């Protein structure tokens, strides 16, 4: 019996299979690659952040972890709250189909309600569970949102410097990433530069406050001026096609006294993307959410679009176990004091050694001016002292580097002599 008989293929289908096989073999013989070249390029050119992190792991294996000062990755060293472990223990008593089974695509109803009620307590809002879509972390939140609010050929504005993966996700949605430089004195969002970047093709603006990589927290005044500019632009557009503001907020709870305004209360056409990677120190568990506020005029159409994007991109549901953890731990505080201590130790020393940096009001990153114009060359030289920093070019701004001070306090202190030696080379 032939394989075609076994598969019960008709003669027409057999001919089609043979034709496709012949075409593939011809292409293979010519050396043509039957793969997606864009995806190949993305995989071959890995994230510079991950590249440096991998290099750090190699060096730690070679010379000992205590001798490598890796500031590359935003990987919290602060432990998850004790309540997380207790919640996991409790969940392990559940029947297997509840613990490990699928949840509804938008998330467990009780988890969505817990998120909405937490936001209502904090911001005086009136959200419901149906306004929340649970996701596999902030990356999934952003990719789903971008695919929901844009069409191929649209433009999405980012504030430079910006998290490098924004460009990847924007371009995957078939859109063009347009950079609007921040104010280089304060690294506040520059409303004027955003206005200059807006065209008829602009579909969305992404903001990230507290900001990665600068640590800047956008003020209420800045956000109100941005909202007014967007409304002025929207007034000249089809009412069904306003510019959407995507507020990426994984660092919301990690602030040092600054106010982090609730963006949907300032601009109505806002979608919020969130992750528990930083606030609960759960970066590897991949759980977060999208909020489509019920005050957003496009909400009735936008939430189904988010669901459709998640389905199309292959996100079946957020992890069942950690949705249950979120229900129990949603209002657990972040250990901001640990990050504040790291920040003080690092900034005090770098200032003494002659480095220039942006005073961070939030997140756990320090944005430092390189001691030579080429930040890549500077970061390569830093490796001589086992100092691993991320050059700024991939963030859309040359001449700086990013340090993630979410490492242990011991790493900060032990790295300081190396930072001084490096600075001395440039004197």
Go through the PLM ranges and name each one:
Residues 96-240, 252-266, 271:
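Conserved core of the PLP fold type I
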Residues 58-64, 122-124, 229-242, 294-300, ...:
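Alpha-helix termini
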Residues 268-340:
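Conserved core segment of the aminotransferase class I/II
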Residues 12-33:
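Short, Lys/Arg-enriched N-terminal segments with co-localized hydrophobic residues
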Residues 35-137, 144, 322, 329-336, ...:
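N-terminal small-domain helix-loop-helix segment of the aminotransferase-like
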């Amino acid at each position: 019996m032939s394989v075609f008989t076994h598969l019960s293929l008709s003669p027409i289908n057999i001919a089609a299979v043979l034709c496709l096989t012949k075409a593939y073999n011809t292409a293979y013989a010519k050396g043509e690659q039957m793969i997606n070249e864009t995806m190949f390029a993305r995989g071959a050119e890995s994230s510079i952040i991950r590249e440096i992190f991998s290099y750090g792991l190699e060096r730690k294996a070679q010379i000992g972890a205590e001798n490598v000062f890796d500031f590359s990755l935003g990987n919290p060293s602060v432990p998850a709250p004790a309540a997380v472990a207790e919640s996991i223990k409790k969940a392990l008593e559940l029947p297997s189909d509840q613990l490990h089974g699928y949840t509804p695509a938008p998330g467990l109803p009780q988890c969505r309600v817990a998120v909405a009620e937490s936001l209502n307590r904090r911001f005086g809002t009136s959200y419901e569970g149906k306004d929340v879509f649970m996701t596999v972390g902030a990356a999934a939140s952003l990719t789903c949102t971008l695919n929901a609010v844009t069409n191929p050929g649209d433009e999405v504005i980012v504030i430079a410097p910006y998290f490098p993966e924004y460009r990847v996700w924007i371009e995957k949605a078939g859109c063009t990433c347009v950079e609007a430089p921040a104010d280089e004195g304060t690294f506040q969002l520059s409303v004027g530069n955003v206005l200059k970047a807006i065209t008829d093709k602009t579909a969305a603006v992404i903001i990230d406050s507290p900001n990665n990589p600068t640590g800047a927290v956008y003020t209420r005044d800045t956000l109100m001026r941005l909202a007014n500019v967007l409304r002025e632009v929207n007034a000249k557009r089809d009412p069904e096609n306003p510019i959407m503001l995507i507020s990426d907020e994984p660092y919301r709870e990690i602030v040092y006294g600054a106010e982090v305004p609730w963006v949907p209360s300032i601009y109505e056409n806002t979608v919020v993307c969130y992750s528990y990677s930083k606030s609960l120190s759960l970066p590897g568990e991949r759980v977060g959410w999208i909020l489509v506020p019920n005050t957003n005029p496009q909400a009735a159409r936008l939430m189904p679009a988010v669901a459709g994007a998640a389905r199309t991109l292959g996100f079946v549901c957020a992890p069942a176990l950690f949705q249950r953890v979120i229900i129990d731990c949603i209002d657990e505080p972040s250990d901001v004091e640990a990050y504040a201590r790291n920040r003080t130790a690092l900034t005090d020393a770098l200032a003494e050694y002659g480095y220039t940096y942006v005073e961070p009001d939030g997140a756990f990153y320090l944005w430092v001016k390189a001691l030579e114009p080429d930040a890549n060359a500077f970061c390569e030289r830093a490796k001589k002292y086992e100092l691993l920093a991320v050059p700024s070019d991939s963030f859309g701004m040359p001449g700086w580097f990013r340090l993630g001070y979410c490492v242990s306090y011991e790493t900060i202190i032990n790295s300081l002599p190396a930072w001084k030696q490096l600075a001395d080379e440039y004197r």
